[in-house]
Amino acid sequence: MKQKLLELILTHAYRYSEQPFTLASGKKSRHYFNCKEITLVPDRLELLCKFIVERHLDESGILKPQAFGGLTMGADPICYGISLEFRKQDKNIYPLIVRKFSKDHGTNKLVEGAVHEVKSCVIVDDVITTGGSTIQAIRSMRDSGIVVVQGVCILDRQEGGMDAILAEGVQMFPIFKKSDFGNLEHE
């Protein structure tokens, strides 16, 4: 399963360009991993979430919490998919979505989902570069009274994000690291 995911990422999500891409972190890179090409395609998302639930959690020592959540939009489909995989085992593991900004109407909540049912959460992201988006989600979860126990992401770009997140007290367990994709040309 993991090898198939790696091949799908290389085929569908990875892009190289002489003209650098601007990443969410603001950094520039000729290497771009658009994991939404995995998470927004049903059969690819299903394979990803099945791998996370059936293999990655146990192999990484990730505790099974009450919820999986992260910053919209990278985490959204992954959290929903993981929740549905657990439903196949007759377990309710809730998806939580963290907004980037609170709305100026309604409840003004940053964290959406069954927050009242949840005390602990595994934080989720698709790609981590500097860790800024993940840290924003962790802080919003904590402000909502949720303990973030650990984290999972599809790809660690190996640019300092894991250390920044660990400094927040959360250990991340990436499925892949950029180095897993071979000797990509240096920046």
UniProtKB/Swiss-Prot annotation:
Record-annotated disulphide pairs: none
Top EC category: transferase
A molecular-function term among this protein's GO annotations: orotate phosphoribosyltransferase activity
Binding annotation for 5-phospho-alpha-D-ribose 1-diphosphate: R99, K100, K103, H105, D125, D126, V127, I128, T129, T130, G131, G132, S133
Stored InterPro entries: OPRT (IPR023031), Or_phspho_trans_dom (IPR004467), PRibTrfase_dom (IPR000836), PRTase-like (IPR029057)
Cofactor(s) this protein requires: Mg(2+)
Binding site for orotate: T129, R157
Swiss-Prot/TrEMBL catalytic activity: orotidine 5'-phosphate + diphosphate = orotate + 5-phospho-alpha-D-ribose 1-diphosphate
Protein purpose: Catalyzes the transfer of a ribosyl phosphate group from 5-phosphoribose 1-diphosphate to orotate, leading to the formation of orotidine monophosphate (OMP).
Family, similarity comment: Belongs to the purine/pyrimidine phosphoribosyltransferase family. PyrE subfamily.
Subunit structure, interactors included: Homodimer.
The name this protein goes by in its record: Orotate phosphoribosyltransferase
Biological source species: Leptospira borgpetersenii serovar Hardjo-bovis (strain L550)
Lineage: Bacteria, Pseudomonadati, Spirochaetota, Spirochaetia, Leptospirales
